[in-house]
Each structure stands twice: as C-alpha cells, then as structure tokens.
C-alpha cells in the first residue's frame, strides 16, 4: 500500500486493517487452543504444526464463505429484494 506524501490510510482502510488483525489473532488463538497440547519441548511437534495449518485454512475458508453470503444479502437488500 502506498500513500501520497503527507497522507495515510483512510478511516475505512484503518478499520478494515484492524478487523483483519482481530480476525487473524482470533484464528491463531482458537487454533492454538485446539492444536497445541504439550509444552514440554519448547517447540511444536509436527502434528501440532499440521493441525494449526489445517485449522487456519478451515477458519479462513469459513470466513470467506460467510463474507460472500453477507455480500449477496447486502446486494439483495440494495436491490429492494428483502
């Protein structure tokens, strides 16, 4: 993202960035709780890393699907169909 000199992101862009950060942190926390079961080695075992990757992909896919549905509903509302 590049901005003209002296300008920064718009308020809408900043809100979107904050929402994406919150979403990312939420996914990370949820997947960590679901997948990391032991703290004995100081490192994740391969199964935990694989679980976290799969969990994050599932969460992201679900978010994208919900986002698409929300967009469709908003389009219908804008067209006076609701």
UniProtKB/Swiss-Prot annotation:
It comes from the Eukaryota. Coiled coil: none annotated. Gene3D superfamilies: Mitochondrial import inner membrane translocase subunit tim13 like domains. This is Protein C2. It comes from Sterkiella nova. The gene is C2.
């Amino acid at each position: 993202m590049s901005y003209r000199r002296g300008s920064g992101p718009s308020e809408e862009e900043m809100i979107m960035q904050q929402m994406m950060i919150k979403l990312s942190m939420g996914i990370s926390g949820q997947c960590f709780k679901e997948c990391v079961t032991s703290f004995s080695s100081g490192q994740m075992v391969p199964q935990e890393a694989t679980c976290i990757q799969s969990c994050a992909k599932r969460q992201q896919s679900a978010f994208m699907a919900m986002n698409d549905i929300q967009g469709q509903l908003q389009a219908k509302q804008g067209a006076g169909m609701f």
